[in-house]
Amino acid sequence: PAAIVLDGVIHLFYQSYGQFPRDYICHATSTDGVNFTRDPSNPVFMPTGAWNCGRAIDADVVAFGDKLLLYWATRDPEMERQMLGVAAAPLESDFSAGCWTQLNPDASILCPELPWEQLCIEAPAACVHDGKIYMFYGGAYNCCPQQIGCAVSADGVRFTRLFDEPMIRNGGPGSWNESESGHPYIFEDDGAYRLFYQGSDDHGKTWRLSRAEIAFDGNGLPYVVQ
């Protein structure tokens, strides 16, 4: 799930699951972070277009200008390749089902192209830095191994990869993340960027969480602070 606090209200965006390919993005709100009220219009978003199967999972949201951008993962109609899309709603809206406009009606905003990405780009994790959106993502399906890449966009729709190789790799034999470093989430904490991600050393039987600090060099390239 993805959460954002706006005007003292926590907006939680989560997915239905187990109805594959009919899993969609839902919305709930809370003022205390514990007790949530489901949006009566759920699901609030499902993608359209011949390029995808109609599924949407792995929600992430980021405020950008006067819009809330909702990133999600979907698959092609053959249910083989996983890729990303984006929708937008006015920040002053209630984010219910009628508020969202899909910004990529004809194609994905990021699909697997590099060898290490294999057949999957998923788990979008977006943050705003210096007026641009940086998108961290999981490349390859779970434990294949999944690793973390990064792309950047000036408008939140058209993304350019920053690296041809993973920014955060899986570990070597015997390490805690031998099978995967994946499913990132980026959080800005008073100007510091914290990237949380999962790892496994037994092909997904056991999962662990880790955190890396991300900084940006003079050219706007993100890097892991050692």
Locate the predicted segments by residue.
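Beta-rich carbohydrate-recognition and catalytic domains
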Residues: 2-54, 62-119, 127-177, 188-226
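Catalytic-core region of carbohydrate-active enzymes that cleave or remodel glycosidic bonds
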Residues: 183
